């Protein structure tokens, strides 16, 4: 009776909300053209499941436990821990937040970051430990242990008993789990939160014999979408000119910097060159990615901060925080000024949408999704500014996500129509990536189908320059990184 009533109530709610939706063409279009087809698609890929290697899962769990034991042993041999235990008269337990708080802030005298728990105590979460690790080794050791324990307990140990007889994990994907419209994942495993820094979990997602894991990632998708939305001719020409996008951007933005231009004329990369200048790195630009990857990532933060409408203060704070080196508001202001002097259309688009959000408290995406932003009316300027930035983020993130989702749905349908359902199986969408298990002799065909569907013109394309698709192919989802690290 309960199950039957659940279905009845759901249908009644459907009738109620459908009547409301049809009155708004944009929202009804999202429902009819995106959500309904995507719902059927996600049902299919959830049934397909994520392919795992049981033997590798077991081996990986043992490997991770060994690493945990080694990390704990290293922590306990550290002089500060021994002194703390002697003073306390008991063993130190890194899982005890009370003991950890006493060790870090009282015994070691590290300055609290200002972040507090719900009870008002100083926080010792991952963000805090990362910041404290800049001043002492112990927080990094504790963070390392926590991360390894989480990988083992949340993924390696939890996945194995939940696998079906065919060694596949059937988890969930949600169309309604985020405010940006991106997919979320829940159930047996959250596919959106698989560790990126450690390949051990990805390495356990393994194709069956005769098949390969194929991952398609959109390249520079959000910048691409912003260029089209803003109708910024100069920014679109950067894509149309081919070559390295970020290098081309730098050639335009920093055209008056003769020293920097010399780097680009010899094949430099935008983010690497920016990092070399901003952080005064003792190497050539083409060596930055290998020797100073962190600084290069910080340089990227400047570029994307500009695109999302972050001001000098926000960019200065973010780069300073992430890099550990002071990046002044003056430096941030100069970069923003140079950027917008070249890309007038992007600046106008950002300004127009900021005003619309501030006036209305909502914004629509290109495909018709509506993001409600009531906090723009907050009397707290910080909260209001953050809400505006969230709206700008939504405009580009939701479109890139929808391009990926719509393309994947279309590709899945074409694959079934062509009779390849058992030979090309999309099993997950992770951020802006489409994952599939494909027969080795049909990989080229699969790439052709998916690329054509992703790059189809849906009113968000640059003429003669479709959005970029990068493909990775391998026996497992780590694409060789698992074997390289663990043998």
Can you say where each PLM-predicted feature lies in the sequence?
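Short, contiguous acidic/charged loop-to-helix segments that flank catalytic cores in large enzymes
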Residues: 159-164, 202, 215, 236-239, ...
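C-terminal structured "cap/appendage" subdomains that terminate the fold
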Residues: 418-470
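Structural motif
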Residues: 1-5, 25-34, 219, 240-244, ...
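Function-dense linear segments that define catalytic or interfacial modules
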Residues: 172-284
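Interdomain boundary/hinge elements
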Residues: 239, 332-335, 461-472
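Hydrophobic alpha-helix feature that most strongly marks membrane-spanning transmembrane helices
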Residues: 46, 50, 62-65, 69, ...
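Conserved "right-hand" nucleotidyltransferase catalytic core of DNA-directed polymerases
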Residues: 1-200, 210-212, 219-222, 252, ...
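Conserved catalytic core of nucleic-acid polymerases
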Residues: 47, 170-171, 175-176, 250, ...
